[in-house]
C-alpha cells in the first residue's frame, strides 16, 4: 500500500498483505531502500528513497513503512519490449557492482509460507497440487551463485516520469540467475517474449527461463489468493490461476 503525504513530495510504502508470509518484512523493506539508494547514487534510472527522511524503515502504530520520492502518477500503459529488455540488461550491469548479497531466490519463500497458512480460498487438494508444483520446479533450478537481481522486474515496475522510465519496487531483491528477472515479464502475455529477449541481448539458459516463468506463475497464484483475503475483486483471478495448476497436475 502506498500513501502520498501531500504537500510533502514523499510517498509512504506501507507493508500490508506481505506481512502474511513475511513476518520479517522490515528486513525486505530495508534491503529495498539500501539497493535503491545505491542505484540512485550510481545514476541508474530508479525511483529514489525520499531525501526528506533517513533511508531507514519506520515502525509506527503497528505498521512497517519506508519513504520514497513522490512522482506524479503516469498515464496508463506499459513500456515496449525494447525498453524493457534493454533497461533490464543495463540494470543488471549496475547490480553486478552492488557489494551486498541479498538472499538467494528470496521471493520463492513466500510460496511454502502461504501454503502453510489456514486457507480461505484453496482446498486441501489445491494445496497438495501447489506443493507438488513448487517441489518439482524448485528442483529444476540449476545451482548457481547468480548475481544481485531486481527480484520483481516486470514491466509494471517501470514507471514513466519526466520523459523516461524508472525502475521501482525493489522489495524482492535477491540473488539468482538473470532468468528470474526476465521471467517477471516474459511469463506475461501482455508483451512479446521474443522481442524482450532480443532487446536484453545477453545469453539466457532457455530451460532455466521456462522454469522461472512457471515459478513466477505459481507465485502469482498464491499472491492473488492472498490479495483476495482483503480485496474480493482478486478472487476470480486466483480461482482461474488455480484451475490451470489442477489441469496440469499429474
Per-region residue spans from a language model:
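Active-site acidic catalytic loop and adjacent metal/ATP-binding pocket
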Residues: 1-6, 10-13, 49, 135-182
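A short, glycine/Asx- and small/polar-enriched loop/turn
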Residues: 4-8, 59-64, 215
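A conserved alpha-helical element in kinase catalytic cores
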Residues: 14-61, 78-91
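ATP/Mg2+ or Mg2+-diphosphate-binding catalytic cores
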Residues: 16, 109, 113-125, 223-250
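Conserved short submotifs of the Hanks-type protein kinase catalytic core
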Residues: 61-73
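Conserved kinase catalytic-core helix
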Residues: 71-103
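Hydrophobic alpha-helical segments that form the core
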Residues: 110, 212-222
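Active-site Asp-x-Gly
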Residues: 160-210
Amino acid at each position: 500500500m502506498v500513501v502520498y503525504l501531500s504537500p510533502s513530495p514523499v510517498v509512504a510504502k506501507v507493508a500490508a498483505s506481505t506481512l502474511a508470509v513475511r513476518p520479517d518484512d522490515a528486513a525486505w523493506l530495508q534491503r529495498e531502500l539500501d539497493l535503491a539508494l545505491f542505484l540512485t547514487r550510481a545514476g541508474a534510472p530508479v525511483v529514489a528513497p525520499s531525501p526528506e527522511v533517513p533511508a531507514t524503515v519506520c515502525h509506527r502504530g503497528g505498521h512497517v513503512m519506508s519513504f520514497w520520492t513522490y512522482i506524479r502518477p503516469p498515464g496508463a500503459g506499459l513500456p515496449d519490449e525494447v525498453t524493457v529488455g534493454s533497461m533490464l540488461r543495463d540494470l543488471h550491469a549496475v547490480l553486478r557492482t552492488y557489494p551486498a548479497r541479498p538472499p538467494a531466490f528470496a521471493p520463492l519463500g513466500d510460496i511454502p509460507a502461504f501454503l502453510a497458512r489456514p486457507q480461505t480460498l484453496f482446498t486441501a487438494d489445491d494445496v497438495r497440487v501447489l506443493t507438488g508444483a513448487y517441489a518439482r520446479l524448485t528442483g529444476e533450478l540449476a545451482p548457481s551463485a547468480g548475481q544481485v537481481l531486481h527480484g520483481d522486474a516486470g514491466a509494471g515496475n517501470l514507471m514513466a516520469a519526466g520523459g523516461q522510465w524508472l525502475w521501482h519496487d525493489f522489495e524482492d531483491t535477491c540473488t539468482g540467475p538473470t532468468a528470474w528477472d526476465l521471467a517477471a515479464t516474459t511469463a506475461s502475455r501482455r508483451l512479446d517474449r521474443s522481442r524482450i529477449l532480443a532487446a536484453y541481448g545477453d545469453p539466457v539458459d532457455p530451460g532455466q527461463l521456462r522454469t522461472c516463468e512457471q515459478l513466477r506463475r505459481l507465485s502469482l497464484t498464491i499472491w492473488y489468493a492472498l490479495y483476495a483475503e482483503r480485496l474480493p475483486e482478486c478472487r476470480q483471478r486466483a480461482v482461474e490461476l488455480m484451475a490451470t495448476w489442477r489441469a496440469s497436475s499429474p
